């Protein structure tokens, strides 16, 4: 079983605001629709290169799309 990523994202919200379908955004960034779905559902973290491509597609920075918890493991 694939472990969900701790990285959250707002890709779906940005995509919907831009009026893009999953297929359109996937084509723009060069991935399959299934890959985009997995990223939007936080089941898969994109590579850094792909993350930049997604951010560029919306004209925003990485920190506008992705967030990582400040204490992901509950440090002792």
Give the location of each predicted region:
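Key DNA-contact positions within bacterial/archaeal DNA-binding proteins
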Residues: 34, 44, 63
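Short alpha-helical DNA-recognition segment
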Residues: 20-38
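Residue-level signal for the short linker/turn that defines the boundary of a DNA-recognition helix
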Residues: 9, 19-20, 46-49
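Short, charged recognition helix plus adjacent turn
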Residues: 1, 56, 66-76
